[in-house]
Amino acid sequence: MLRAINQNSAKVVKSLKQQLVVLEATNVVAYTGTKSFTTTKTFNNTQTKPKIFTSSNVLSFSSPSSSNVFSEILNKRSYSSKGKEITMPALSPSMTEGNIVQWKKKEGDQIKAGDVIAEVETDKATMDFQYEDGNGYLAKILIPEGTKGIEINKPIAIIVSKKEDIESAVKNYKPSSQASSTPVQEEAPKPKQEAPKKSTKTYPAHKVVGMPALSPSMETGGIASWTKKEGDQIKAGDAIAEVETDKATMDFQYEDGNGYLAKILVPGGTSGIQINQPVCIIVKNKEDCDKFADYSVEEQSSSSSSSSQESTPSSSSSSSQESTPSQSSSQQTTRKSGERIFATPAARFEASSKGYDLSAINGTGPNNRILKADVLEFVPQKQEVAQQQQQQTTTTTKKPTTPTSSGEFTDIPHSNIRKVTAARLTESKQTIPHYYLTMECRVDKLLKLRSELNAMNTVKISVNDFIVKASAAALRDNPVVNSTWTDQFIRRYHNIDINVAVNTPQGLFTPIVRGVDMKGLNSISTSVKQLAEKAQNGKLHPSEFESGTFTISNLGMLGIKQFAAVINPPQAAILAVGTTETRVVLSNKPDSPYETATILSVTLSCDHRVIDGAVGAEWLKSFKDYVENPIKLIL
């Protein structure tokens, strides 16, 4: 909404969707729309410098008749002119600082959501830093490559939404640590509240160890068992506990030097522990262990909170005044129980550190993905904060969940793996338009070749190994199937990494055989056996089951003739393999009109957004050719 006011009297310009703009001047242009604009209009016959205004930062104009002064009150930061700070991300659970190895983008380059902008060296490895908060341009690199010891959340670059804003963003940039000079209305002094009673007991130097994030999608975990007991010595790399993640039961290795386990804060068998919630205490000297016998997380938290309030009594009030979050409590999202929450790693880390429930935060990223900015702008309701604090303090005393039984039924609590599997499969069926193609393949030649190879090799090759290899060859011939759907583009993968579904007592796992098109049958067979054994024992590492470009599910060994599998998101296809059966078929031999044949039935489930029906049929045609002529797989 854009209007020019040429009268001397005061005017009020009102936008239906934005704030009010109050005018009392001559020849004033006022705007409350959604895009920024530049004005050089005259205010009371005084030429002003060009200035950019947006609906997000213009709250009021006024020109008091007594002083003829144009006053601008800014209450929100405008990224169109100042840019957005990008901070050092936390790319691993124990990371406190990192190094910029190399910048993948240079100043002025365009950046799209998902682009890798830098290589960051963490305390574990060198990893890609993907920018996930929308599109923009890299205005300024604040930390040059090669810099080491950069603390988490320290600004490293400036991003702007428009290329023409780069110059002004660099010129006007001030580090976030420097408070802006925005005038803030003072509040009447509040009556001083009595500080909570502090703990007077002091403890020797110690380290509070929190629940680690052992998989990218992990939000809570469970302590299956402690492999160390109180008083035991711990060396770097020792497994101190078995942790149940949303994917598997994994060893929690302590890697921050040597010490002694002074206190276990969460007993074995406890589930639903938030990431970074304290689980144990480590000390350097064994004689200090006994001093933590009565250590209490709640007592220490109360003491820390009290100390913080005494040192900065006005910080909370000023913070609440300065921030103008876009999400009010009435606008907060309520998600269904079990619904999958999409959030960036930075957002999960920030929410975890603040104790926020991600299900209550509105996501503004692609597909409603929760971004770090959404977490920073989120203001929880008082009731939610109280519930979160109560939940965190009671988790350590929560007893392990056990099945409850009555005369007519038994209630078995959901494991983390079962919850995640349910959410993922529901998401797949609700968001991916499935269709199914079935084809029968004659596998007599394959079975004969398998017998000959197994007679010569120590590695025993299975029919499933041939299917994995044939699938990779068909993906190489039909690369459209080796893709995934996003709202902005279809991503086609150059690598062929195949997930092989494995059923375990803990639930369904899909470990990955990577680079299948480059492996031989012996290598594929060895990899599948090793991964399946790890899955059965709950020892899979996240890198062995996260991602993948195509999935195979084989129920043939259970006598299933044919079935249709659910696509493993974000992949675009999954192959369901049934059992083989012997049939009588027409023969091409002149001496016999009939012969027996071994037939294998397979069904390809496809994402119709990515794979058209004809493309899926071509893939199955290629797959059938490789299965019926397996010599092609070893050439």
Curated annotation (Swiss-Prot):
Transmembrane segments: none annotated. It comes from the Eukaryota. It catalyses: N(6)-[(R)-dihydrolipoyl]-L-lysyl-[protein] + acetyl-CoA = N(6)-[(R)-S(8)-acetyldihydrolipoyl]-L-lysyl-[protein] + CoA. Residues 298-334, 387-404 have a biased composition (Low complexity). It is an enzyme of class 2 (transferase). GO terms for biological process: pyruvate decarboxylation to acetyl-CoA. Gene3D superfamilies: 2.40.50.100, Chloramphenicol acetyltransferase-like domain (3.30.559.10), E3-binding domain (4.10.320.10). One of its GO terms (molecular function) is dihydrolipoyllysine-residue acetyltransferase activity. InterPro entries: 2-oxoacid_DH_actylTfrase, Biotin_lipoyl, CAT-like_dom_sf, E2/Pdx1, E3-bd_dom_sf, LAT1, PSBD, Single_hybrid_motif. Residues 342-379 form the Peripheral subunit-binding (PSBD) domain. The modification N6-lipoyllysine is found at residues 124, 247. Residues 403-635 are annotated as: Catalytic. Residues 174-184 have a biased composition (Polar residues). Residues 83-160, 206-283 form the Lipoyl-binding domain. One of its GO terms (cellular component) is mitochondrial matrix. 20 to 30 alpha(2)-beta(2) tetramers of E1 + 6 homodimers of E3 + 60 copies of E2. The pyruvate dehydrogenase complex catalyzes the overall conversion of pyruvate to acetyl-CoA and CO(2). It contains multiple copies of three enzymatic components: pyruvate dehydrogenase (E1), dihydrolipoamide acetyltransferase (E2) and lipoamide dehydrogenase (E3). This is Dihydrolipoyllysine-residue acetyltransferase component of pyruvate dehydrogenase complex, mitochondrial. It comes from Dictyostelium discoideum (Social amoeba).
